[in-house]
Structure formats: structure tokens, C-alpha cells
């Protein structure tokens, strides 16, 4: 089969005609988007292509045909190929992509590789889904026939299938099945997980049937015949039509209750059970056309399909075929899944017993398997044997042997051995035919190679030929060859040639080994070439180096002796370029001297000759001329043109060749000095501090350009200095004195040097502004003013008209405070102890002079400023000020400006008193009256004097904290103490105004707080009996925490013994009984005794009959038919105080003396009476029931009240 799929980005203009016009695909082509692509599917003759039309129906196209289809997303649809085929995506030069499905080449796999097991070629991700293609979801896959044991099962490939109607796609081979997971176990149990998922899905479903049971599947299945068939019926869709189980489903309500959901689940389970029963009625398959490696299976639908439209299914969607080669009860593997009623099994093993059974599957419901049927494949020709092996050889004979291949059910009768008679590529001829597994060939040529191949034959036929193998006969060791001959020698290579040794036939294979000795110090030869050629080029050699070569010949029998040694030398290489020429000595107007060094790489030979070339460097003269040729490395040039640029380069010549030229060196000869310039002249008017000069270019006989000019100035003191040096014809000379005569002259400079100075020009500067004033003098007056005075500066050529004085706190804030002709000025209203600066500038008609130096000064200090912020700290930690806030106040203020003198102290005025404190911003006023208001103010003091007072503030002290109350013990118990303190009816403080802190002393003599609150009583629990405890108490109010009280010590009492259970009474012989009761251990060292009392008949008081430490007592002299009641209590006798503490009496135990004749009935009656008494509640139980009832009623009333209040 050969299917080609072509994809183009545009709609073809001429489409091939469709077969019978059955495929209505033109709407897709006409209405498609520009981004869509046209897919041309070529169907070959004898093939069938199935597609889904636009209306959902299936249409089959018989080949040959070319079907145009539209890809909406531009991707290639999936192509599922049959076994033994592969798909490839090919894009040609025109941009057309083709998916080619071709038979799988056997050369792509090693022997026995299961090439037919990959039904779907792994396509790219963009070939996954396409709406117009129907996926071949269920296909039969068969492994090839291989020799058992040639390849382990884990080497079978795991093919990847497209999504099917099952949860997990699988492909199962025929043998080597241990590496695959069976799918029969997936259907052996009911699908519990799917039932649970479907129960959840039914809650949200309205009218749709179950999605997995009633879903229609129209997958095209390949069944081994190479054609597609439409499987399934259109009536089995999910809408409930046809004969499928969907007919049973009725319309459901839009809203369902939990009861309807349970009924749906039960109905669904019954439906699944009915479908399984129908599918389980399938009969065993029929076997036909049994061959050696293939067989045809066919089967009929399940029997229940013909039971009417409501009793059966219209058509099962698919079938599964399971195969076993381990016997009837062996392990079965699924080898086919599809909708066809026939299956063609291929790639079976010849002469092998197989068992096969079939399942019917409807969506996810699978029926029971049919009865297995067995068959045996036919025998066939043997497998291809392995190549024969060489057992023995001589100069004229070869002995071969081989192993028998797999006979495939028919015994091997003979073997066919063929050879080429030693003639390469001349065909094979038979040299042995027989049943033996060895063969000896004689009368062969020595040292000759022969090619053999083997085939096996049985009664069925002849196998294929084995791989070819070449065997050689023995021969003689070659004679010593002649020494190799030199063909040609290069810089890094040498080509050698040699001839075959004497006595060797032309057919004999001779291998030559060329050895080389690279280092003269190393006497060993190393192999450089091994082969059958008669020539060799040895590369990667050193230049101008001597090497030694020798040759050795060898064949299958051994090596010859080495030949004579050939000595040859590689050629030298051409030298490298010399170094760049360098100037040696000074350069003159007509010549200079140059030198150069030999090249770093001489190429392996001496350099006998150097060439020095020169050019004048002009664009017109671009040709180099040889100025020197010889062995020297320096040369002197003469008779050159002045002021001309020349370029020099050097090269060398040796036996290796001509080197490259070195880098060029540019050299310019010196020019002649320029002539005398004309005197400089003033450009414009002279200024008071500078003049602008200009001059002309001097005349020059050499024609060289002037590079620079030098201007010299002579001052009135006859001091000469250079004021300009540069290429311009004008300059500005500054920093001159006003009204002063200066003399100037100029000279020119070029490559030849300086020319003579010009004649002198005398120039007078204009009058200038005043000079810089000296720093002004600053003095302070007694009234706090500042007097500034200064002296007049020099003013060349004009009188000073005014002075300007600038004043400020720093240089950036200077402001003009005075301008006029006076030489002093007084500053007022300045800040005390402040930094100020000033500067002075003088003016005349010519302009303003420079500023004087900046003068800094500081005004004298004064008394401090008033305190701006004064406050009372209300909350201050007690650790900082331990005094009570009732008798002290904590003042805090901000430090005022000290006006240049550090603050020494502060005066605090309280109205009737005044105190002085040091330089601080916090002070505690002590020894004040509680609950008193004070008016406070403060002033600062420094060395200059006292500053003004601040504003008054009012502050009030707090009341005194409360005193601790008296602590008393209201009640004491064995494990608790109830303490009380103070008077709860006191009206000294308002309710909730006082808080008490009660502390208990622990074993480490430390007091720990056990209560804090407004209450006047507290009960301390979990104490130890008869133990002393120490307490103290503290009261706290808004005024603060009061002091702790003195320590009070209270002791707990001793505990009484516990209440005992009712005693047990046992009747003894005669008129006596014995009473038993439980014991109590000694209590903290105090012994425990017991008191037994009895109530006789109708007496109203108990009488004591025993007191002691024993837990039993006997009473005699009792009267029959008389009621006795016994009770017991424990008594604790305190050793330290001799006090006796008695516990509560136990419940009474009744006893009546019985006669022996009625003991049995009496016992029974006693048991019933005891039961009745046990059912009656005791006093404690009755009290607990009453408390529980009241608590329940309280909680109920609380809930009712809360409900009505919230409403």
C-alpha cells in the first residue's frame, strides 16, 4: 500500500475528479478561511479510504482516487498505518508536505526484530486529531516469527495507539508475553469506579443517557485485508434509538430527588447486567486457511442479538480475540480488538499449537469469553542458518563446519554450501550438498581468500542463504622487500613508493608497514603506515629535518624482515618577514640611517640576502624601488628631498624562498627653516589688562609650511617671556598692567627649525579699574554694634569713585549693605554670638576692582533666651523616681538658646519659693503637699547673666496611696483557706476604685501573686493539710500602689477519714455472724481505728459493739427472725494532739439470722432484695440527680431568654 498526503497553503485551481461524486467536500474548499490548508489524499488501486461527510454519514472511496480535504487548523490529520508499514512527513522544494506510508524496510531492524509490531508510526504533535478523519482505533497487531531465545521479551517495542473506546490502549504480542499486562483482568470484575463516577454524574444529568454505555462509535477498523469497513450501526447512537440499551432509557425530570438517583443507579446496574448476559452468549470462533505463519479466524455475533428490539443489542461495537501458546489453560493475551467478524492472524510460529477465544465488548461492558478453539500451524522451510565457521586450514585445503538452524516442524534433510572459487564478484557455485554439518575443500591455492554461504533444506523447501564469510588458506612469509624510494619531499611531507616482494603472486594479499625514525637520538623505528597500497605520503613532519624509513611486508602467515633504511630530508620553508625598519640616529633634511633585525623564523636555512625598498609615499608614486640588496642589516640614505615623506620596508631571500615584506616605516625628512616675520600689530584697541595681536606668514624658500609661531613679550623691567606658542596667526595676551608699555616680537617654526625674530612692536595698555582692596577691619562697640573700616587700594589711571561693602552670615548669603565714598560703616541689630562675614570692592570710571579677601567675625555672647516649653511628666516609671507622685512632681523642659554662652543653671519659681538646679532638662520637685496645685515658671542662667522667665504652668500633686488592710482567715479546711480583709461596706472609696493584690510565700521565701481584684475575700485551694502558709496584701488606687502589709500566717486543718462502703455480713454456725469492712491506710503517720454500730429490730438508735483497728468482728447470741443493721466508720487518732477525728458512717447493711432448712430460699430472697435495694438510689445519688435537674432547667431558661432578647 502506498498512500500520499499532500498539504498546500492555497486552494488548487484544478482538482482531480472524485470517484462517483460521493464525497461532498467542496463546501469546505469554497467557504474555508485563508489560513486553512487543502489536503490531497491519494488512494492507490485496490485500497479503500473512509471519511465522514459533512452530514455525519460515512463514505468509502475506492482507489485509484485523489481526495481533496480541508484542514481547518493547518495541521496534518493522523494517519494510522497497518502492520509492517511506516509513515514519514516529507516536504519538497515547493513547500508541499507529503505523508508517505510505505512498507517497512527489513534493513532497519536487526535479526528477529519485531518490525510489524508498530501499527501507528509516531507522528508529530500537530498530527493528533482531525475532524474529517476517522481513527483506526482497533487494529490487529501481530509480532514476527523469530527464533525462541534470540531476543528477550523486554526488547519488543511498546507501540503507542490513538485513543480508543477503552481506558488504556494496548498492543499484545503473540509470544514473549510476560512483558505485557493482560486486559482480561480489567473486565473480570464489575466497574466499581465507573459506577461510582456515574452515580455522581446522574445528579447533574437531565435527559441524557449514560455517556459511556450509550455512546455511538464509528471508528474504522483495519482487520488485516488492507481495506476499511464501516463498523457499527447508526441506530446504536446515544439518543436511545435502535436496538441498543439506549432504547430502555426514558425522559427524566429536570429536578431529581435522592430517591430517584438511587433508582437510576439500580436501573443502570440492571442494564449493565443485561448487556453482559447478552455479550456472554458468543460462540467459539471458527479457524480456516491454516498456514505456517498465518490463520484466518471468524466468529458469529452473540446469540442474544436476535431476541427482538428491546431484548438485545442491534450490533456489538467491537470484539476482542485472546491467543495462548501455552495450552488450553495457559495465559491468554489480547491480540486483536475491532468491529469485524473476521481476523487474519499473521507472524505465527510454524508447527506450533495455539488456543484462541473471543470476547464481545459494548463500550465499557465486556462479556464472558467464548469456548477456546485450538489449531496447529503448518510446517515450512527452515530458518536462515548462521554463517559457516572455519575449523581448520592449510596451504591447499579449508575445513568448514556449521550448526543446524530451526527446522520449523520438518526435519532438515540436507545442506547446500556455495563458494566463489576465490574469484571476487564472479558469482557463487555449489561446492557441497549433503546432510553432514561439515565440509573439507582441497586443491586450493595458498594464501588465497574464498567466500562461502550456506542454506538448509527440508521436505517443505529451502531456507535463505546465510551471511557471506571469507576464509583464507595458508601461505609463505614474504621475502624482505627493497628499500622504499623517495618520490617527492615537501616542507612538512614526504611521498614514498615501493614494489611488491619477489616471489609473491598477484592474487596474494600483502600488507605493508612503513616505519619511521623521527629523532636522531632515538634509535627505534615507529610504524607510520599500514596498508596494501604501494605508495604513501607521510605528513605532519618537521621542515628541513632528516628522517629514516624502512619497509616490512606481511601476510596471513607472518612478517618479513625490515628492508634497508632510506634517509631523506624535508625541504626548508620560506623565512618569515624581517622586523620593521627603525630609525638609527637623527633625521636630516637630506637623509637618515635605518636598521632592521633578522626574522624570528628563518624557515630552517640561513638568510644570505636582504632587500630594502623605498617609496616617496605620494599617491602618484606607488611603486617600490630597491634601495639596498645585501647581507647587512642597516643602511644610510643620502641625497633625499627635504620635507618629503618616505616609506621603507624590508624582506629576505633564502633557499626556502622569498619572504613577505615587513611592515612599512614612514619617515619624513626635515624641512628648511622659515624666513623672518613682519612685526606684530594690534588688532582693535588695547585694553587695560590685555592686547590682541596678529601677524603675517613669513616668506620661505623651501616651500615648507609653517607649523607653529612663537610670540615673545618684554616687560618694563626688561624681563622677556614667551606669551604664545601655536599654529594661529593671532593671539591675545592677558594679565597686563593698565597704562604700561610692552614690547612684542614673533618668529616662525617648521620641520627645519625656528626662523629669526621679527622687529619689535611697542604697545601701551589702557587705564584699568582699581586694584584689590585689603581686608576690611572689624571692631565691636560697647553697645553691641560692629564698626567696619578699610583703606583705599591702588587705582591706575583714575580716581576711586565709591566703595561697596557686602555683609552676610556666610559667603552664599552676602548682601550689599553700604556703597559710597566713605572708608568706614557701622552695623547694628546683629544676633549675639553669631558668625558673620564681609568683603569690599572699589570702583572707578574704568570699572570695578576685584573683591577683597573674605573677613569672618563673631558677635559677643548675651544672656540666654526664655524657656519655650515647660511641662509636667504625668507617667514616669517608679524605678527612675522612687518618690511617691503624691509628694513630688517631675518637670521637663527644652533647653533654650544660650546666645553664645553655655547655660550653667536654671531658676524654678514655685510662687512662695525659688530653687536653682544645674544644667539639666529634667528635675523632680520633692517634699510637696498631696493634692495641691502649684504655679511654676523657669529661667536659664549663663556667664553673661539671667534670661527672662518662661510662662506659668499649673501642676497638681496626686493624693496619697491607700494603706494595706488587715488580713484574716475566715475559714480553714484540710486543702483550703478562706481569707478576708478590709470592710466591704466602707464608703471611703467608690465601688471598683480599690484593687487588692494578695501574695503567697513559696518554699524559696519568695512572694508570688495569687489574686488581684476588687473583692474582699479569696479562697486559696489545693493546699496541704495541717501546713502553715504566709500571706501579705497590698491596696492600690488611682493615687498609686500602697505599701505591703505585714506577713500573716495561717494553717490548714487535718482531714477526717473517708466514708467506708457498707460492711459485709456472713452468718456463722450457731446464733452468730461475722462482719467485714474495707480498711483505710494510716493518714500522714496517724493510726486509723474503726467503730462498728448495730441497730436491732425496731430500735431507734445505733449501739456501738466494737472499736478497734481490726477490719472484722464476730457477734454471737443473735435472735432469729430479727432485723439487724450494721454500719462502720473510720477514726483518725492524731499523735501530736491526741485528738480523734471521726469520719462519716458507711451505709447500713441489713442482716437476719436464718434457719438452715430455708437457707436456699432465703438466699434467693436475699439476692432479690439485694437487687431491689441496689436499684434504689442512695442519698448522695438522689442529691446529684436533683442538682443535675436544676442545672438542665437553668440552661434551658437561659437559651429561651437569649432567644427572646435577640428577637
Curated annotation (Swiss-Prot):
Sections of the chain in a coiled coil: none
CDD domains the UniProt entry points to: FN3
Cellular component terms (Gene Ontology): endoplasmic reticulum; membrane
Domain Fibronectin type-III as annotated: residue spans: 281-380, 384-476, 480-573, 577-672, 676-768, 769-862, 874-960, 961-1055, 1059-1156
Bilayer topology annotation: Single-pass membrane protein
Keywords linked to the UniProt accession: Membrane, Phosphoprotein, Repeat, Transmembrane, Transmembrane helix
Chief subcellular location: membrane
Official protein name in the record: Fibronectin type III domain-containing protein 3B
Species in which this protein is naturally found: Mus musculus
Organismal lineage: Eukaryota, Metazoa, Chordata, Craniata, Vertebrata
Gene of this entry: Fndc3b
Amino acid at each position: 500500500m502506498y498512500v500520499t498526503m499532500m498539504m498546500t497553503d492555497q486552494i488548487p485551481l484544478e482538482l482531480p475528479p472524485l470517484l462517483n461524486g460521493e464525497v461532498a467536500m467542496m463546501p469546505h474548499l469554497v467557504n474555508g478561511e485563508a489560513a486553512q490548508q487543502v489536503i490531497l489524499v491519494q488512494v492507490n488501486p485496490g485500497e479503500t479510504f473512509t471519511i465522514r461527510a459533512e452530514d455525519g454519514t460515512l463514505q468509502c472511496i475506492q482507489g485509484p482516487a485523489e481526495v481533496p480535504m480541508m484542514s481547518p487548523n493547518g495541521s496534518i490529520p493522523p494517519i494510522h498505518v497497518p502492520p509492517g508499514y511506516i509513515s514519514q512527513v516529507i516536504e519538497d522544494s515547493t513547500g508541499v508536505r507529503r505523508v508517505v506510508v510505505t512498507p517497512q524496510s527489513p534493513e532497519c531492524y536487526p535479526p528477529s526484530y519485531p518490525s510489524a509490531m508498530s501499527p501507528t508510526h509516531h507522528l508529530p504533535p500537530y498530527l493528533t486529531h482531525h475532524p474529517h478523519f476517522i481513527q483506526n482505533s482497533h487494529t490487529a497487531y501481530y509480532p514476527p516469527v523469530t527464533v525462541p531465545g534470540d531476543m528477550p521479551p523486554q526488547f519488543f517495542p511498546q507501540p503507542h495507539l490513538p485513543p480508543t473506546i477503552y481506558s488504556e490502549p494496548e498492543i499484545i504480542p503473540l509470544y514473549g508475553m510476560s512483558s505485557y499486562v493482560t486486559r482480561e483482568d480489567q473486565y473480570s470484575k464489575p466497574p466499581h469506579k465507573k459506577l461510582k463516577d456515574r452515580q455522581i454524574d446522574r445528579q447533574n444529568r437531565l435527559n441524557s443517557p449514560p455517556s459511556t454505555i450509550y455512546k455511538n462509535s464509528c471508528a474504522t477498523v483495519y482487520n488485516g485485508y488492507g481495506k476499511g469497513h464501516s463498523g457499527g450501526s447508526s441506530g446504536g447512537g446515544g439518543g436511545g434509538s435502535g436496538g441498543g440499551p439506549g432504547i430502555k432509557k426514558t425522559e427524566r425530570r429536570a429536578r431529581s430527588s435522592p430517591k430517584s438517583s438511587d433508582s437510576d443507579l439500580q436501573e443502570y446496574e440492571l442494564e449493565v447486567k443485561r448487556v453482559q448476559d447478552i455479550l456472554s452468549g458468543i460462540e467459539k470462533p471458527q479457524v480456516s486457511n491454516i498456514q505456517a505463519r498465518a490463520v484466518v479466524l471468524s466468529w458469529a455475533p452473540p446469540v442474544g442479538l436476535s431476541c427482538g428490539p428491546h431484548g438485545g443489542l442491534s450490533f456489538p461495537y467491537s470484539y476482542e480475540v485472546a491467543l495462548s501458546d501455552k495450552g488450553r489453560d495457559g495465559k491468554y493475551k489480547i491480540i486483536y480488538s475491532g468491529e469485524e467478524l473476521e481476523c487474519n492472524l499473521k507472524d505465527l510460529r510454524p508447527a506450533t499449537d495455539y488456543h484462541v477465544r473471543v470476547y464481545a465488548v459494548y463500550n465499557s461492558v465486556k462479556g464472558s469469553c467464548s469456548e477456546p478453539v485450538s489449531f496447529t500451524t503448518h510446517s515450512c522451510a527452515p530458518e536462515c542458518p548462521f554463517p559457516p565457521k572455519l575449523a581448520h586450514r592449510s596451504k591447499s585445503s579449508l575445513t568448514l563446519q556449521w550448526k543446524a538452524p530451526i527446522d520449523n516442524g520438518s526435519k532438515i534433510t540436507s545442506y547446500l554450501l556455495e563458494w566463489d572459487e576465490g574469484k571476487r564478484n564472479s558469482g557463487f557455485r555449489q561446492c557441497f550438498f549433503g546432510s553432514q554439518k561439515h565440509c573439507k575443500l582441497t586443491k586450493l591455492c595458498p594464501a588465497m581468500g574464498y567466500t562461502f554461504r550456506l542454506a538448509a533444506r527440508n521436505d517443505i523447501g529451502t531456507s535463505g542463504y546465510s551471511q557471506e564469510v571469507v576464509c583464507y588458506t595458508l601461505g609463505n612469509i614474504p621475502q624482505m622487500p627493497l628499500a622504499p624510494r623517495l618520490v617527492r619531499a615537501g616542507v612538512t611531507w614526504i611521498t614514498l613508493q615501493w614494489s611488491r616482494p619477489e616471489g609473491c603472486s598477484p592474487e596474494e594479499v600483502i600488507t605493508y608497514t612503513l616505519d619511521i625514525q623521527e629523532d636522531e637520538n632515538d634509535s627505534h623505528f615507529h610504524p607510520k603506515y599500514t596498508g596494501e597500497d604501494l605508495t604513501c605520503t607521510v605528513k605532519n613532519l618537521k621542515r628541513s629535518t632528516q628522517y629514516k624509513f624502512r619497509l616490512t611486508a606481511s601476510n596471513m602467515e607472518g612478517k618479513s624482515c625490515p628492508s634497508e633504511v632510506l634517509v631523506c630530508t624535508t625541504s626548508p620553508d620560506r623565512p618569515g618577514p624581517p622586523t620593521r625598519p627603525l630609525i638609527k640616529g637623527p633625521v636630516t633634511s637630506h637623509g637618515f640611517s635605518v636598521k632592521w633585525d633578522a626574522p624570528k623564523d628563518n624557515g630552517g636555512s640561513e638568510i644570505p640576502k636582504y632587500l630594502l625598498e623605498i617609496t616617496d609615499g605620494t599617491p602618484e608614486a606607488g611603486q617600490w624601488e630597491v634601495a639596498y640588496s645585501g647581507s647587512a642589516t642597516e643602511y644610510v640614505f643620502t641625497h633625499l628631498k627635504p620635507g618629503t615623506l618616505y616609506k621603507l620596508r624590508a624582506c629576505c631571500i633564502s633557499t626556502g624562498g622569498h619572504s613577505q615584506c615587513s611592515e612599512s616605516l614612514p619617515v619624513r625628512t626635515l624641512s628648511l627653516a622659515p624666513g623672518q616675520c613682519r612685526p606684530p600689530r594690534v588688532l582693535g584697541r588695547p585694553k587695560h589688562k590685555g592686547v590682541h595681536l596678529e601677524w603675517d606668514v613669513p616668506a620661505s624658500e623651501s616651500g615648507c609650511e609653517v607649523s607653529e609661531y612663537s610670540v615673545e613679550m618684554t616687560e618694563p623691567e626688561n624681563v622677556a617671556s614667551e606669551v604664545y606658542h601655536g599654529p594661529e596667526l593671532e593671539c591675545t595676551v592677558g594679565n597686563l598692567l593698565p597704562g604700561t608699555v610692552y614690547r612684542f616680537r614673533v618668529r616662525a617654526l617648521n620641520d627645519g627649525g625656528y626662523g629669526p625674530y621679527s622687529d619689535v612692536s611697542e604697545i601701551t595698555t589702557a587705564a584699568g579699574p582699581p586694584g584689590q582692596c585689603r581686608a576690611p577691619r572689624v571692631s565691636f562697640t560697647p553697645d553691641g554694634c560692629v564698626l567696619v573700616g578699610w583703606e583705599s587700594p591702588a587705582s591706575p589711571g583714575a580716581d576711586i569713585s565709591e566703595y561697596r561693602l557686602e555683609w552676610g552670615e556666610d559667603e552664599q548669603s552676602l548682601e550689599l549693605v553700604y556703597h559710597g565714598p566713605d572708608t568706614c560703616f557701622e552695623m547694628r541689630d546683629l544676633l549675639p554670638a553669631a558668625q558673620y562675614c564681609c568683603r569690599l570692592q572699589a570702583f572707578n570710571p574704568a570699572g570695578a576692582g576685584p573683591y577683597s579677601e573674605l573677613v569672618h567675625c563673631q558677635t559677643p555672647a548675651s544672656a540666654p533666651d526664655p524657656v519655650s516649653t515647660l511641662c509636667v511628666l504625668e507617667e514616669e516609671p517608679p524605678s527612675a523616681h522612687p518618690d511617691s507622685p503624691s509628694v513630688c512632681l517631675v518637670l521637663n523642659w527644652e533647653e533654650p538658646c544660650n546666645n553664645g554662652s553655655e547655660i550653667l543653671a536654671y531658676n524654678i519659681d514655685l510662687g512662695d519659693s525659688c530653687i536653682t538646679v544645674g544644667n539639666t532638662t529634667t528635675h523632680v520637685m520633692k517634699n510637696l503637699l498631696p493634692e495641691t496645685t502649684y504655679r511654676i515658671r523657669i529661667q536659664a542662667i549663663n556667664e553673661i547673666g539671667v534670661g527672662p522667665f518662661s510662662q506659668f504652668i499649673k501642676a497638681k500633686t496626686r493624693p496619697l496611696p491607700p494603706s494595706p488592710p488587715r488580713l484574716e482567715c475566715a475559714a480553714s479546711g484540710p486543702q483550703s483557706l478562706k481569707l478576708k480583709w478590709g470592710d466591704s461596706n466602707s464608703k471611703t472609696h467608690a465601688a471598683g476604685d480599690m484593687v487588692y493584690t494578695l501574695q503567697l510565700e513559696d518554699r524559696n521565701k519568695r512572694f508570688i501573686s495569687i489574686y488581684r481584684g476588687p473583692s474582699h475575700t479569696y479562697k486559696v485551694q489545693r493546699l496541704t493539710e495541717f501546713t502553715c502558709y504566709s500571706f501579705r496584701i497590698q491596696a492600690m488606687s488611682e493615687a498609686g500602689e500602697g505599701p505591703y502589709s505585714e506577713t500573716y500566717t495561717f494553717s490548714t486543718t487535718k482531714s477526717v477519714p473517708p466514708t467506708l462502703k457498707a460492711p459485709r455480713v456472713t452468718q456463722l454456725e450457731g446464733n452468730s455472724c461475722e462482719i467485714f469492712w474495707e480498711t483505710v491506710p494510716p493518714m500522714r503517720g496517724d493510726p486509723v481505728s474503726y467503730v462498728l454500730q448495730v441497730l436491732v429490730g425496731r430500735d431507734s438508735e445505733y449501739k456501738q459493739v466494737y472499736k478497734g483497728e481490726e477490719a472484722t468482728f464476730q457477734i454471737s447470741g443473735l435472735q432469729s427472725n430479727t432485723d439487724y443493721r450494721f454500719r462502720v466508720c473510720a477514726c483518725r487518732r492524731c499523735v501530736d494532739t491526741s485528738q480523734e477525728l471521726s469520719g462519716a458512717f458507711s451505709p447500713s447493711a441489713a442482716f437476719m439470722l436464718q434457719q438452715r432448712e430455708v437457707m436456699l430460699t432465703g438466699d434467693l430472697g436475699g439476692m432479690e432484695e439485694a437487687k431491689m435495694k441496689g436499684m434504689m438510689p442512695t442519698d448522695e445519688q438522689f442529691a446529684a440527680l436533683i442538682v443535675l435537674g436544676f442545672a438542665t432547667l437553668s440552661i434551658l431558661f437561659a437559651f429561651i431568654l437569649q432567644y427572646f432578647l435577640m428577637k
